[in-house]
Swiss-Prot record:
Organism taxonomic ancestry: Bacteria, Pseudomonadati, Pseudomonadota, Alphaproteobacteria, Hyphomicrobiales
Family affiliation: Belongs to the RuBisCO small chain family.
Subunit structure: Heterohexadecamer of 8 large and 8 small subunits.
Protein name: Ribulose bisphosphate carboxylase small subunit
Further facts: The basic functional RuBisCO is composed of a large chain homodimer in a 'head-to-tail' conformation. In form I RuBisCO this homodimer is arranged in a barrel-like tetramer with the small subunits forming a tetrameric 'cap' on each end of the 'barrel'.
InterPro entries associated with the record: RuBisCO_ssu, RuBisCO_ssu_dom, RuBisCO_ssu_sf
Function per UniProt: RuBisCO catalyzes two reactions: the carboxylation of D-ribulose 1,5-bisphosphate, the primary event in carbon dioxide fixation, as well as the oxidative fragmentation of the pentose substrate. Both reactions occur simultaneously and in competition at the same active site. Although the small subunit is not catalytic it is essential for maximal activity.
GO process terms (BP): reductive pentose-phosphate cycle
Source organism of the structure: Nitrobacter vulgaris
Length: 108
């Protein structure tokens, strides 16, 4: 697996150091989050702002109890269609730890 140059692009999350995920890899990550019992959500923000200083806007409400990967991917695609010039990320909330279990940018 190829790794991108360290300082070539802005880093928004852990997977930023790897090449862009394929749609199948995104689906597998979402399936893993659902299998953990985490609640999926979709967020978006403007491009060009530093990741730590930017505010991520929630797309609708979290998909509480959603078990379908297709439904989550459909929401990600709908958000991207609505905001084609913005970054879109997937977030999985862990009810037990009361924190994010996973988050990664799907569209940079």
């Amino acid at each position: 697996m190829a790794v991108q140059a360290y300082r070539s692009l802005k880093k928004y999350e852990t997977f930023s150091y790897l090449p862009q995920m394929t749609p199948e890899q995104v689906r597998r990550q979402i399936a893993h989050a659902i299998a953990q019992g985490w609640n999926p959500a979709v967020e978006h923000t403007e491009k060009g702002t530093p990741a730590k200083a930017s505010y991520w806007y929630m797309w609708k409400l979290p998909l509480f109890g959603e078990q379908s990967v297709d439904a989550v991917v459909a929401e990600i695609e709908a958000c991207h269609r609505e905001f084609p010039d913005q970054m879109v990320r997937f977030v999985a909330y862990d009810n037990y730890a009361q924190s994010q279990g996973m988050a990664f940018v799907v569209y940079r």
